[in-house]
C-alpha cells in the first residue's frame, strides 16, 4: 500500500470520487433534461453524429457539433491556463477549476427550462472537458473522471 501523505489534495481518492459523481450528474442532466446530448464525454455524441451523417440528417449532425466543439475548446483552454493562473493568481489551476465547476452548477441551476438547451450543453461540455483534462490521477492511479467505463476498469 502506498503512502498517501505524499499526494496533493487534488490527487486524493475522495476528490476522485466527488469528481466521478459530478461527471455523472452532468451526463444525466444534459441527456435527460437538456436535449438528449451526452456532455460529460464525447463518445456518445460522436456515435450520434456518425448516425446522423449516415442517414443524411444534416441538421441533426450539425446539432452534435456544438457539444463536440465545446468539449474540444475546454481541453484546449485547460492546457493553456494552468501556468498563467499559478503565476498571476498564486493559486493552483485544479483548485480554481473546482471553484469554477461549483459556480457553473449554481448558474445552471438558475437557467430556466425555457432557455435554449445549448446554453447548458456548451457550459457542461466545456467544464467536463477541463475536468477530464486536469484531474488525471488519484493516489497514483491513472483516472478519467468523466468516463464510466474507466471507473469499471480501475475498480
Language model regions located:
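Substrate-agnostic recognition of the 12-TM MFS/MFS-like secondary transporter fold
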Residues: 44-47, 67, 124-155
Amino acid at each position: 500500500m502506498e503512502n498517501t501523505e505524499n499526494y496533493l489534495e487534488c490527487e486524493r481518492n475522495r476528490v476522485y470520487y466527488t469528481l466521478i459523481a459530478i461527471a455523472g450528474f452532468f451526463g444525466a442532466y444534459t441527456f435527460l433534461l437538456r436535449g438528449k446530448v451526452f456532455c460529460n464525454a464525447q463518445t456518445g455524441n460522436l456515435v450520434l453524429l456518425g448516425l446522423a451523417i449516415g442517414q443524411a440528417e444534416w441538421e441533426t449532425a450539425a446539432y452534435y457539433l456544438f457539444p463536440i466543439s465545446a468539449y474540444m475548446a475546454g481541453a484546449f483552454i485547460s492546457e493553456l491556463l494552468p501556468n498563467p493562473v499559478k503565476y498571476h493568481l498564486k493559486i493552483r489551476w485544479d483548485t480554481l477549476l473546482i471553484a469554477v465547476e461549483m459556480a457553473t452548477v449554481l448558474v445552471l441551476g438558475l437557467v430556466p427550462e425555457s432557455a435554449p438547451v445549448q446554453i447548458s450543453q456548451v457550459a457542461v461540455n466545456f467544464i467536463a472537458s477541463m475536468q477530464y483534462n486536469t484531474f488525471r490521477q488519484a493516489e497514483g492511479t491513472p483516472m478519467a473522471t468523466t468516463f464510466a467505463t474507466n471507473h469499471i476498469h480501475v475498480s
